[in-house]
Structures are given as structure tokens and as C-alpha cells.
Curated annotation (Swiss-Prot):
Named cofactor requirement(s): pyridoxal 5'-phosphate
Listed name of the protein: Glutamate-1-semialdehyde 2,1-aminomutase
InterPro entries: 4pyrrol_synth_GluAld_NH2Trfase, Aminotrans_3, Aminotrans_3_PPA_site, PyrdxlP-dep_Trfase, PyrdxlP-dep_Trfase_major, PyrdxlP-dep_Trfase_small
Family according to the record: Belongs to the class-III pyridoxal-phosphate-dependent aminotransferase family. HemL subfamily.
Length: 426
């Protein structure tokens, strides 16, 4: 047995499923998950000593690559001054100033510890600010594991929420309305059915949890217009897209102004950080200045703030996003060319430093139904064969891939060459 197999066997006796987040268990592709010993630049190294070109990037945070010296040094320096104080620090102020400067729609920002905390808190704030209970989310979009967001999407344009996980009361989930991503008609139907009850829409500007599905041109502006028409808030969940699709996020890339923004992943530079913020009048409703309660023992942790501050300063350097786009575009085009040579039907969506691989005969993939029609079994075979070639992709047909500026054009070309060999066997 390999070391990964031995560790996985031991882990399953001690940790539910052997992992601390379900997708890591390789359930979506089968087989034994890799246990990682170290990472550097664009590469992961498993406990058996094999290197992989990494397109998971810790599920998004590693936009600069693994083990970036500026972030590593910032963490070391911060740790020497103490690990946690439970009191305000100068770095929290500097971090808030940096974030609000980089994302102009955020007049104020509150730091938390994860993307889930950010979305959960933003929805509570939207409900408190508007005095309304219902929210709209989109099928195939994931916003963390808060109860109100673990809701199963139905087949119709509009479904009353049904819990997608045991432990979520149906009476609670019923306040979550599920609409179809990239379909404004379904959203208008929800507002017309509940015109005075919907507090907010929460949306991934690029849907990264049904692989990678960018918005159609009219979709995000249409959501903004509907929120204005019916008095609801627009929450853009930029946990994945923030600082990756563009420096000011996908909201800037697509030209839409939210009322609240949720951030995570890159904002922590690899440390556990989330944030939410937006309009000053809305944020003023948050405790201690307002009645909507939110708190956290480790929120604004000095080590996490130091890591995030270092990361964002690096990400803000000229040329970063142009490089991400160039690398991702080359990968997407190369994979499509290689698949076409082998007669394999393939669509690769990409925007900024995100991409998604779909085995499908369709010309495009623009919604949850398109994603569900793709060939998952072929993806599973592709994943494992690419792993044998030393390429680590997301172990699920429903997760986006992530590029970093640490990837070289040689890494990209080697990945395309590996895919060409794999496609020949599919």
C-alpha cells in the first residue's frame, strides 16, 4: 500500500469519511485521495514523493502559487508577536483600508473566519436591514454550509426550498427560494410571487460550484434591476472570484454594483479569512452600532490579517491578472484543441484565473441543467489518467479549476500534452 492509502485507512477510523471537507475524499471520482506533504509554486508533493502540477490551488486561495515568500514571511513575523489577542489591532485597520480601496463598492468591511461565515452573516444582515425573511439563491450555486443555503434545487423555474441535508428543518429552508442561474424569468417569477417578502438575492457572479459557469451578459445587470424594483438587496458572493477574475472582483469585470459583497479564499492568502461588506447604511445595522448581531473569537486574527495583507498587496501588482488570463486562456484553448484531435466532445469555460472542463456534446454550458447533462463517468476516467500523468485537477466534475501566476507556460504546455495522451485513450 502507498502512504496515502495507509493514511486514508487510518483517517477513516478517526475522522468522518477520513477527511475534514467532503470533496477531498475523492467521492466524486473514486479511489484514494492524495495526502499532501508539501507544496511550492505551482506544484503539490504527496507523501509518496510524487509531484503534481496543481490546478486546485487549495480550492482558490493560492492565486500567487504555494508557499509565496511574501506571505510566508508575513506569517512568521506576525507569529513572533503573538498568535491571537481577542482585541483590535492596527493590522485590522490596515487590512480594512486595503480591501475597501481595492473593492470600491465596499464602504465598510467586517472580517470573519471563512466564506461560510461571510455569506451567513451577510444574509442575516440583509434580513435585518430589510425586515424580510425570504432569500433567493440559484440551483448549482454554493455559498457555504449555513442552514438556509443547504437547499435542494427543484426542476421548475422557482422552487420553495427543501433541505438538501438532514438536520436542516423544512420550516427554516422554506424561506430560501431557488431560481435558475442565467435565467432572469425565474427570478422575476419569485419576486412577483413574494413581492414584499424577499430580503436579498445571493449569487456567485461566476458559478464556481457547478464547475465554472460564467454569467450571460444580461444576467447580473438584470438581478441588480430586479432588486431595485422590489426593494431587495443584491449580495454578490465573491469568495471564489474576488481578486481572481479581476482585482476588484467579478463585479468590476462585469460592471454590476452589489449592496453587499462576500469575500474569502484569496483574502487570507491561505489562512482562514472571510469578509463581508458593502453600503455604509447597511453595514451600520451591524452590531455594535446596529441591532444585527455577528461576532467571532478569532475574527481579525493577527496572523491571518498579516497573511491576507501581504497576499493582497502582491495581487494588486501590475500584470498579475493579465498573466492569469493569458495562462488560463492558453490552457483552455489547448485542451479543446487536443480533445478535438481525438474526437472527444469538450467544452472548457474560463474567465480570469478560473476554468471548467465539461465532457459534453453541447456547444455551451450556461446553467445547472447543462452541467448535469455532462458525461461525469468520462470525467472520472480523465481525472485519474491525468493524475497518473502528474496533473492534479479538482476531484469532481462539479468544481472549478484555478490557475496561479506561479504556473509557467511550460507547465501549461506539459498539461496539454498530458491531456492529449489521455484523450487518445478515452
Amino acid at each position: 500500500m502507498s502512504k496515502s492509502e495507509n493514511l486514508y485507512s487510518a483517517a477513516r477510523e478517526l475522522i468522518p469519511g477520513g477527511v475534514n471537507s467532503p470533496v477531498r475524499a475523492f467521492t466524486g471520482v473514486g479511489g484514494t485521495p492524495l495526502f499532501i506533504e508539501k507544496a511550492d509554486g505551482a506544484y503539490l508533493y504527496d507523501v509518496d514523493g510524487k509531484a503534481y502540477i496543481d490546478y486546485v490551488g487549495s480550492w482558490g486561495p493560492m492565486v500567487l502559487g504555494h508557499n509565496h515568500p511574501a506571505i510566508r514571511n508575513a506569517v512568521i513575523e506576525a507569529a513572533e508577536r503573538g498568535l491571537s489577542f481577542g482585541a483590535p489591532t492596527e493590522m485590522e485597520v490596515k487590512m480594512a483600508e486595503l480591501v475597501t480601496n481595492l473593492v470600491p463598492t465596499m464602504d465598510m468591511v467586517r472580517m470573519v473566519n471563512s466564506g461560510t461565515e461571510a455569506t451567513m452573516s451577510a444574509i442575516r444582515l440583509a434580513r435585518g436591514f430589510t425586515g424580510r425573511d425570504k432569500i433567493i439563491k440559484f440551483e448549482g450555486c454554493y455559498h457555504g454550509h449555513a442552514d438556509c443555503l443547504l437547499v435542494k434545487a427543484g426542476s421548475g423555474a422557482l422552487t420553495l426550498g427543501q433541505p438538501n441535508s438532514p438536520g436542516v428543518p423544512a420550516d427554516f429552508a422554506k424561506h430560501t427560494l431557488t431560481c435558475t442561474y442565467n435565467d432572469l424569468t425565474s427570478v422575476r417569477a419569485a419576486f412577483e410571487q413574494y413581492p414584499q417578502e424577499i430580503a436579498c438575492i445571493i449569487v456567485e457572479p461566476v458559478a464556481g460550484n457547478m464547475n465554472c459557469v460564467p454569467p450571460l451578459p444580461e444576467f447580473l445587470p438584470g438581478l441588480r434591476a430586479l432588486c431595485d424594483e422590489f426593494g431587495a438587496l443584491l449580495i454578490i458572493d465573491e469568495v471564489m472570484t474576488g481578486f481572481r477574475v479581476a482585482l476588484a472582483g467579478a463585479q468590476d469585470y462585469y460592471g454590476v454594483v452589489p449592496d453587499l459583497t462576500c469575500l474569502g479564499k484569496i483574502i487570507g492568502g491561505g489562512m482562514p479569512v472571510g469578509a463581508f461588506g458593502g453600503r455604509r447604511d447597511v453595514m451600520d445595522a451591524l452590531a455594535p452600532t446596529g441591532p444585527v448581531y455577528q461576532a467571532g473569537t478569532l475574527s481579525g486574527n493577527p496572523i491571518a490579517m498579516a497573511a491576507g495583507f501581504a497576499c493582497l498587496n502582491e495581487v494588486a501588482q501590475p500584470g498579475i491578472h493579465e498573466t492569469l488570463d493569458e495562462l488560463t486562456t492558453r490552457l483552455a484553448e489547448g485542451l479543446c484543441e487536443a480533445a478535438q484531435e481525438a474526437g472527444i466532445p469538450l467544452v472548457v469555460n474560463h474567465v480570469g484565473g478560473m476554468f471548467g472542463i465539461f465532457f459534453t456534446d453541447a456547444e455551451s454550458v450556461t446553467c445547472y441543467q447543462d452541467v448535469m447533462a455532462c458525461d461525469v463517468e468520462r470525467f472520472k476516467r480523465f481525472f485519474h489518467l491525468m493524475l497518473e500523468e502528474g496533473v492534479y485537477l479538482a476531484p469532481s466534475a462539479f468544481e472549478a479549476g484555478f490557475m496561479s501566476v506561479a504556473h509557467s507556460m511550460d507547465d501549461i504546455n506539459n498539461t496539454i500534452d498530458a491531456a492529449r495522451r489521455v484523450f487518445a485513450t478515452l
